């Protein structure tokens, strides 16, 4: 027994020894087997433009985690690359992860098991299955892992840290974010390198680009880089919130935020295609708040300017994102982004001036993203002066020849590659693209030139030739444009350069609020904004808007180079020590070196400084104003320069320089610019720009005083006026040959119409012989139709718009122009009474009995809308009626609606007699020919006794109406000082208004109880209510309103169809005459006698309704009308035609049976034989077009219910 047991123990030892030897051999083989062949280069992660740079990986070998124990050592095969324990981020569970290489039957993958024992069981089961498959035995069941992640399907992998774990490996799959927690940093690095390498290789293999990188041609390298699959080193999964750009551009949702060396890429979940790419140069600022990270991008991005807010896991991740973004931005352009992170926005003025100047005048200097202006090489440099408020700007552009040495500020950086030179925003006002000569009235004194040069040196960021090695390298590490401070050195407006804004900084416009680091560039409201900061060796306090801080201004002493401490009270460069000396000692001493060295340089002739407002003790205003110069009249350059030189000589040099055309009000700090005529004077220079300044010009105070066309509140009352405008006030000018340039603004044949203010502000200048305007420079005469452009205003006819000219017809064509030049007496005394509409010429009749006059200029369309508002003091300028004006009217397209305030005496009701008719309201419906209706009332007949036949004879299509012996007298009445022979109403309709329906489409009915006339249109189920209530003429002309009655409160219940009919009826309230004292007793008898007479049908008008308004016994008239028409009183009373459809049909049948053509000659014969005593029968039936629906109504409930029609309710007054 003992021997057997001993032999068994010996065998077991031998088996264990052999197993251990085999295991050690396998592990040695795995440890010495590389993942890639030794001749193959390792994978480059980050090639191409979309990858984060070059990260070379050393040859990785298989290794084991420190957590693996010896008992876990077993042969696992060559496919296992790395294995070990890691924790899951979500719950912190410890799992056993295994990274496997790609094999013939499986891709590269990451697996994890519950623990190492499970992994060993799976390995043994896999080995047993392989043996069974080889021997043909039964294959045992395999133990699958908990999860398998295919690496080529992963988006990327990244190292991460959050509030809970410091060593995270974040693996981004197609649809999720999977993070693992390592024990230490080395473990994290090892897993990250292997995962990133295997992911990239798997992607390359899938894309067919796996292999050695091509050598030789750059094109081959570029093609290989373009074929590289996207792989990003720094990736975060964020949730873009619907705020800012996320809301406007619909970018909200889950994204992968990928950061590279030059751009930020947003990739949506479940895709690898970039949704948005933002250049790092376009990022204005970035930051984080709690668990939110935000980016503010500029307008050069594809999504426009705005903010992107993203939610991440926690605040630590947001902070890490912020820091990494800043690191990338600093690495890309340290100087630029240091300035941007502190002050990311450019002031409005500087940015606008940059765009204007660079686009119009710097064609060789292209704009780069965000509006930054890039300057190239040594081919040219720009010398800028940007001085705010009381300082002018000078731009001197000088080309440097190849033999000429570069300027001092360019030295020390010429060896830099162009791509690494920082970009600068150059604010170039357009007014500086001219060379200014010294004023002939004042030659700069010798002590002024070094003073100006010292001020130039204080604003520039350059060193002298002696300080090139010492200070040139410090102060000019970037491409900084010198900021020359010519003039008074206004402390708050000077800026830029090494002294006031840090080493190597350059200011936008007039400098900016500078900090110790030289990065404060926005400058508050001013046109400032430092776009480049150096190493921050400058000291500046940043006072106010755009200022260079206390003591940063110029104003150097002539000889010693010590500044005045400019500050906010700096003066005109004459040692006004008003600023804070304590803060500017260092700056003055720093500027002194430039003062002494710059005096030896050759400079362009400096312009004389502007008036010194700070020297008087006043605080310099900045207010954030900037100046824009737009096109001015070049023809007045010499004249204005001579005038300003003369003014400068008389003022003793207070305003020095021809370019100084205006000054600002020192007591006003209004940031708003009034855009009204006559406020800012054009510059007296050769520039193409006109100043739109916020303040009046002190040099031309008399020329541009407060405009007479504004009321007490400062509003401009602009509408066309009859009276000519006043000439533009101007200052005395020197007599020269260019005097004619001013007169062309006042030509009567101008292309503009004077838009004058309201009542009380019209100058009393006499009109010219043509009655036209005397100025064209105040407002444009927009696009008037042809009849108006031949008016007294002297325009040509080439438009289709209707001017709203008060109380005045503007004529109907060029043939009318002679009638307007009858002199001042006729123009100002008689109102216009000409009827502008007539019958069609093919019918052979006109609006008046004079039908033999041929029409003139039929194409001219005297369409007008004339009215005078209440309280207007300008009298109309009418003309006497002429036959030419009556005949010239062809086809019309507009409604002639006149509102004229009548100046008359309110007479007693007993002595007034029959007053003038106030018209009828009609609203045209769309017809087959025209959508407009021409209606004009008030053209008198030469006979005091007006015949109704003559009245209705003007209606096209109404010639066949039997009007035998019909005369309605309209006796004249004295109204004020104007006596007219007769009063009447004349309705002239558009010939194009051919009805689209039959005459029987509408019926008219009179309600005896309410005294109203209803015109019913059965097709539209709409009726027009014409009120005949007496009114007073003293009231202003009313406005007739078509309205739909919301609630119908009739006397009896209505059926469903009747309710619908009643609910859609529109009431037209035409306010009638003063009183209805006249009676026509024989009206009912005359109407009832000819029973066989057909029902009177007047197409397209309510003229008879107007005539009915003159009769007080309208009830009797309509009683006879109903008897003749066969309509019972029950159906006609109380608006029965609206409620009863049968009565309406009777009206239609009667009208349908009438033959207009057959009765045409009969009506004419009756008219010839008719006597003058019998009054005409009032009309029994008329029809009107249904009111036109407004297609542009936005509110179907409200807009369709309110239809307004303006009518003419006034009488034309004449002196026979």
Curated annotation (Swiss-Prot):
Q: Where is this motif: YXXM motif 5?
A: 752-755
Question: Motif (YXXM motif 6) spans which residues?
Answer: 801-804
Q: Where is the composition biased (Gly residues)?
A: 488-502, 509-570
Q: Where is the PH domain?
A: 79-200
Locus of motif YXXM motif 3: 689-692
Q: Where is this motif: YXXM motif 2?
A: 672-675
Report the residue ranges where the short sequence motif YXXM motif 4 is annotated in this entry.
715-718
Tissue pattern of expression reads: Expressed in skeletal muscle, brain, heart, kidney and liver.
Q: Where is the composition biased (Polar residues)?
A: 819-836
Write down the InterPro entries for this protein, in alphabetical order.
Answer: IRS, IRS_PTB, PH-like_dom_sf, PH_domain
Alphabetically, the GO molecular function entries are: insulin receptor binding
Basic residues composition-biased segments: 410-424
Domain of life from the UniProt record? Eukaryota
Q: Where is this region: GRB2-binding?
A: 868-870
Alphabetical GO biological process terms: insulin receptor signaling pathway
Where do Pro residues bias regions lie?
Answer: 603-612, 722-732
State what this protein does: Acts as an interface between multiple growth factor receptors possessing tyrosine kinase activity, such as insulin receptor, IGF1R and FGFR1, and a complex network of intracellular signaling molecules containing SH2 domains. Involved in the IGF1R mitogenic signaling pathway. Promotes the AKT1 signaling pathway and BAD phosphorylation during insulin stimulation without activation of RPS6KB1 or the inhibition of apoptosis. Interaction with GRB2 enhances insulin-stimulated mitogen-activated protein kinase activity. May be involved in nonreceptor tyrosine kinase signaling in myoblasts.
Q: What is this protein called?
A: Insulin receptor substrate 4
Q: What is the lineage of its organism?
A: Eukaryota, Metazoa, Chordata, Craniata, Vertebrata
